[in-house]
Amino acid sequence: MSAKQPRLPLLGEITAPDGARLTVRVRARDDDAGAPVIVLLPAMGTPARNYLPLVRALHRRGMTVVTTDLRGQGESVPVPARGVRFGYRDIVEHDIGAVLDLVDTAYPTAPRLLLGHSLGGQLGLVHCGLFQPAGLDGVVLVASGSAWYRTLGRDGARWLVRSQLSALGAGILGYWPGERFGFGGRETARLMRDWARQMRTGRYTVPGARVDYERALRAVTLPVLAVDVENDTMAPPTAVDHLCAKMPAARVERLHYACADAGGRPLDHFRWIRHHGGLVERIGAWAERVVLASDRAA
């Protein structure tokens, strides 16, 4: 998707203690102050602007949609380079919470959901377990599973080798030039090490983390809609199930999004963003049934 496409209106900007800056944008339901707010966390190496077709569809379904880039992508600064050091810990323990605080201030009475794609969903869940954000009502995972190579079927060994070589290369170069290798976008060496470690071990183990991230996942109690996508070799059903199994206290509902649900259009780890026809309606229906009904009862 071209960067020349119109940008969403600005909701605010966030500056981290280390000087990193995130831009938060919103497509608001100005006609309904109580409309549910969905906060979209992108996949690794994927700018938030790539999700504009999905944002528009969710907005038409009656939701206010908030977007931000994962650190190092899109409008965020700094760009990963030699000497720029951040990883999973910075995103989990600062960035996601700062975005949710901004949303809480802007929409204090509205129901709020996280929608995480791939890495965005994984790190969003860890944040939820670690901080138990009071204003959050549920989490939607789409094409978001554990990156453990044993969950990736026949492609697992190839992904394991790729991940370890990527982390090694990033360590040598001081960053990962994913745009040159066709995978992952431009990332810091630290983030690539975090990703490669989880790929190898199946565990979210991050040096210097506030607590054990595996323990944080076990503390998630929110409603979770976990969607696997047909033809997705990067987050197949086994990978999604492995991530969900880490949250025994969560109220997890599983859903398979098939090409037939998308009107026969092709799907994979990224194509669902454009071919979202049947998925947006299911997300909206789940939110109304599980999350909004709970809010009304309270």
What are the roles of these predicted feature ranges?
Residues M1-A28:
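N-terminal cap/lid segment of alpha/beta-hydrolase-fold proteins
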Residues A43-T46:
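Active-site glycine-rich loops that stabilize anionic/oxyanionic intermediates
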Residues A48-N50, V55-A81:
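Conserved alpha/beta-hydrolase
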Residues R85-D104:
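Alpha/beta-hydrolase active-site loop
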Residues L115-R203:
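Alpha/beta-hydrolase-fold enzymes
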Residues V220, A226-D228:
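Short beta-strand/loop motif that positions the catalytic acidic residue
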Residues P236-K246:
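Short alpha-helix in the alpha/beta-hydrolase fold that links the catalytic acid
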Residues E253-A298:
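Catalytic active-site module of serine/aspartate enzymes centered on a nucleophile-bearing elbow/loop
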